[in-house]
């Protein structure tokens, strides 16, 4: 009889120690979610030039496996939620090599490059820039490399993201 009671208490003790506190895990997850949502608000390191229109002799062409943006086309890039990042090819032409080129995607600053007569590179797309829809890549050169200064070159090209099946 004592063995039965001891066995029952042992099983109860092991079961009690093995359980997890789901309430605290849920609170931790909620706190992490709200923190990550706060951090996901997009801010741009360099502001997008206001009221800028195409100017200068610079040209850009974006390329995907489906084609490129020549003649105003918007090449298609297939993506889904499993794609964390994808590369988008960009060809730059007729930019001033002594100036930095500020690259924006959907008016959010991505990177600064030194490009000249003919330069090929790629940028990494992730998060919002991989959501289905039409997206815009903008290359801008400023006087004295000051993003608040006069725009010397301003050119845009588009690409379209479609849901991968």
Enumerate the language-model features and the residues they cover.
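C-terminal motif of bacterial Sec signal peptides marking the signal peptidase cleavage site
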Residues: 13-16
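Contiguous segments within soluble domain cores/interaction surfaces
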Residues: 68-115, 120, 124
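Surface-exposed, short loops/turns at beta-strand junctions within beta-sandwich domains
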Residues: 127-134
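Short acidic/polar inter-strand loop motif in beta-rich domains
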Residues: 142-150
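N-terminal, intrinsically disordered, polar/charged segments of Gram-positive cell-envelope systems
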Residues: 6, 18-75
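Positively charged n-region of N-terminal signal peptides that target proteins for export
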Residues: 1-4
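Short beta-strand elements
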Residues: 149-165
């Amino acid at each position: 009889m004592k063995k039965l009671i001891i066995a029952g208490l042992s099983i109860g003790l092991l079961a009690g120690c093995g359980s997890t506190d789901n309430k605290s895990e849920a609170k931790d997850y909620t706190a992490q979610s709200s923190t990550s949502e706060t951090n996901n608000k997009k801010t741009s390191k360099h502001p997008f030039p206001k009221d800028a229109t195409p100017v200068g002799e610079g040209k850009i062409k974006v390329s995907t496996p489906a084609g490129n943006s020549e003649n105003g086309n918007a090449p298609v890039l297939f993506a889904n939620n499993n794609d964390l990042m994808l590369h988008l090819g960009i060809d730059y032409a007729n930019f001033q090599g002594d100036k930095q080129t500020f690259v924006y995607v959907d008016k959010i600053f991505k990177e600064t490059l030194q490009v000249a007569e003919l330069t090929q590179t790629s940028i990494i797309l992730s998060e919002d820039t991989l959501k289905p829809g039409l997206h815009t890549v903008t290359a801008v050169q400023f006087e004295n490399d000051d993003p608040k200064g006069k725009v010397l070159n301003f050119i845009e090209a588009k690409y379209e993201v479609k849901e991968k099946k």
